Amino acid sequence: MRDSTPLIHPTAVIDPSATLADDVRVGAFSLIGADVQIGAGTEVGPHCSIHGPTRIGRNNRFIGHAAIGGEPQDKKYAGERTELVIGDGNVIREFVTINRGTGGGGGITVVGNDNWMLAYTHVAHDCHVGNHCVFSNNTTLAGHVTVGDYVIISGFAGAHQFCRIGAHAFLGMGALTNGDVPPFTMVGSESLGRPRGINSEGLKRRGFDAERITAIKRAYRTLYVAGLPLADAKLQLAEQAKSSDDVRGMLEFIEAAERPLLR
């Protein structure tokens, strides 16, 4: 039977300058503002607001009451043109907020593909989120945070502005990080999170074999358990990286740090 439900609810407000693919659905009382582009297969649920400049890819779902592409919550923002770019296949749950960038922070907020952002998640200005991440309820990313692929952030956890969270990392419930989190690292559920091993279970689920996981564990022990100064730990990691691409990625992440490493 053919679905007779209209694609655009009669109570939705669509700015004439917005560009929506032919099969985009927009629910009741939602607002699509000026300079917004939405790709094919995307569903915008009821009571959502999407402001431009914002570009949204294909097959995304905004469940309801999401506030997307709003002005950055930064007092230095002076109305300059900035944007938000969202990729494909993301699920954005109730009351999620994702803000545009700032002129001083690169001018763009980016969300990749196939991410799940659960209720009340906040992604601030100039954040860059990778692919296949899960942000549980009330996850909070301050401005300029970078999140790698396959990161899981538990409920009520958050990251200080300018922090980086490496690929495959895991932040426990309520964990707050004010330093860079290396790839594969688990952060404990303390008020100020501390390293608590590697995300072994997540790596197994993603197809990492025992040899790769063993190399990552060894690198973690070098960095966090051996009691070495960071400079000495990096020298040992450089040796280990000769036989492990994963360790090489960890070392490159550490070398690129502009904030202190979570220790």
UniProtKB/Swiss-Prot annotation:
**Cellular component terms, GO, for this chain's entry?**
cytoplasm; membrane
Keyword field contains Flavoprotein: no
UniProt-listed Enzyme Commission number(s): 2.3.1.129
Annotated signal sequence is: none
Q: What class of enzyme is it?
A: transferase
Q: Which cysteines are joined by disulfide bonds?
A: none
Q: Which InterPro entries is this protein grouped with? A: Acetyltransf_C, Acetyltransf_C_sf, Hexapep, Lipid_A_LpxA, Trimer_LpxA-like_sf
Which catalytic reaction applies to this protein?
A: a (3R)-hydroxyacyl-[ACP] + UDP-N-acetyl-alpha-D-glucosamine = a UDP-3-O-[(3R)-3-hydroxyacyl]-N-acetyl-alpha-D-glucosamine + holo-[ACP]
Q: Mind telling me which residue stretches traverse the membrane in this protein?
A: none
Location in the cell: Cytoplasm
The pathway that the record names for this protein is: Glycolipid biosynthesis; lipid IV(A) biosynthesis; lipid IV(A) from (3R)-3-hydroxytetradecanoyl-[acyl-carrier-protein] and UDP-N-acetyl-alpha-D-glucosamine: step 1/6
Q: What would be one Pfam family of this protein?
A: Acetyltransf_11
Main location group: cytoplasm
**Keyword terms, alphabetized:** Acyltransferase, Cytoplasm, Lipid A biosynthesis, Lipid biosynthesis, Lipid metabolism, Repeat, Transferase
Q: Which GO terms describe its molecular function?
A: acyl-[acyl-carrier-protein]-UDP-N-acetylglucosamine O-acyltransferase activity
A GO biological process held by the record: lipid A biosynthetic process
Q: Which domain of life is it from?
A: Bacteria
Please report which protein family the annotation says this sequence is part of.
Belongs to the transferase hexapeptide repeat family. LpxA subfamily.
General function of this protein: Involved in the biosynthesis of lipid A, a phosphorylated glycolipid that anchors the lipopolysaccharide to the outer membrane of the cell.
Q: Tell me the subunit arrangement.
A: Homotrimer.
> What NCBIfam families does its record include?
lipid_A_lpxA (TIGR01852), PRK05289.1 (NF003657)
Q: Write the protein's name.
A: Acyl-[acyl-carrier-protein]--UDP-N-acetylglucosamine O-acyltransferase
Give the species this sequence originates from: Xanthomonas axonopodis pv. citri (strain 306)
